[in-house]
Amino acid sequence: MGITMFKEFKALLSFFTRIPIYVEDFDFENIANYFYLIILIGYVFGIFSLILGYIFSFLLPNFLSAVLILFFIEYLNGFHHIDGLIDFGDGWMAVGDKRKKLMAMKDRYIGCGGVVFAIFFNLMAVISLSYILDINILYLLVGEVCAKLGMLSCSTFGNPLIEGTGRYFVKKADEKFLTIGIILSLPLLLIFSGIERKIVIIAIITTIITGLCMAKIAKRHFGGVNGDVLGASNEITRVVVLLSIIASIKVFSIYLLG
């Protein structure tokens, strides 16, 4: 990793987490040139969740452990992605054309759509995490890396809105960025073997498709992708990936028993 790349990675880490990192000359245009490094931030979140998982699951029941893991993950990113999910839900459920939906997504009030989205996806995340703790705790790492890959996928397939900091990332992201992101995700395969490795491959494919779907939904409802959509992509992708892992395990179990 070159000096410039390391500098921009520090800036990305500072922007997407609450980790106190000194960054001089914070420039979104420059940071966006290395947006694919967000996958490495996914590893940071994943390792953090693994540490929490080992500690809490030793002391508490899985459900309570899952609640605490999700809370501290969201705290580490400053609750920005949940905020994006709430705004995304408000905008999606708003009645009217793209302009009205975008206004609903950007206003400072929380509507019913945002509340329901936040409750539903966080509840699904907690339940899924509690199952994962019972199956294989290493899938926590997969979930966080894939959540960031989902953001990159959404950026790649989406078109940027005019306003907001998210436009810098969406404008720069392309197929090359996504390819690098996928390559950076492949080390996940090294910590699994056999059927579990196939499940991780399914999770990565599911992630890319989820990001594509988020980009298409954003274009239809808002005209493009902004920071709120990217934040929502992170939260929704995590849930979809964890569900795909749980479902794949069940399908493979039935296949093997049959």
Swiss-Prot record:
Domain of life: Archaea
Leading EC class: transferase
The keyword Lyase appears for this protein: no
Localization, UniProt: Cell membrane
Membrane disposition: Multi-pass membrane protein
Annotated Gene Ontology cellular component terms: plasma membrane
Keywords associated with the record: Cell membrane, Cobalamin biosynthesis, Magnesium, Membrane, Transferase, Transmembrane, Transmembrane helix
Keyword Methyltransferase among record annotations: no
Needed cofactors: Mg(2+)
Reaction catalysis annotation: alpha-ribazole + adenosylcob(III)inamide-GDP = adenosylcob(III)alamin + GMP + H(+); alpha-ribazole 5'-phosphate + adenosylcob(III)inamide-GDP = adenosylcob(III)alamin 5'-phosphate + GMP + H(+)
EC number: 2.7.8.26
Transmembrane annotation, as ranges: 35-55, 56-76, 113-133, 137-157, 175-195, 198-218, 238-258
Gene Ontology molecular function, alphabetical: adenosylcobinamide-GDP ribazoletransferase activity; cobalamin 5'-phosphate synthase activity
A GO BP entry: cobalamin biosynthetic process
Major location category of this protein: membrane
UniProt pathway annotation: Cofactor biosynthesis; adenosylcobalamin biosynthesis; adenosylcobalamin from cob(II)yrinate a,c-diamide: step 7/7
Reported function: Joins adenosylcobinamide-GDP and alpha-ribazole to generate adenosylcobalamin (Ado-cobalamin). Also synthesizes adenosylcobalamin 5'-phosphate from adenosylcobinamide-GDP and alpha-ribazole 5'-phosphate.
Record family assignment: Belongs to the CobS family.
The protein, known as: Adenosylcobinamide-GDP ribazoletransferase
Organism: Methanocaldococcus jannaschii (strain ATCC 43067 / DSM 2661 / JAL-1 / JCM 10045 / NBRC 100440)
Gene: cobS
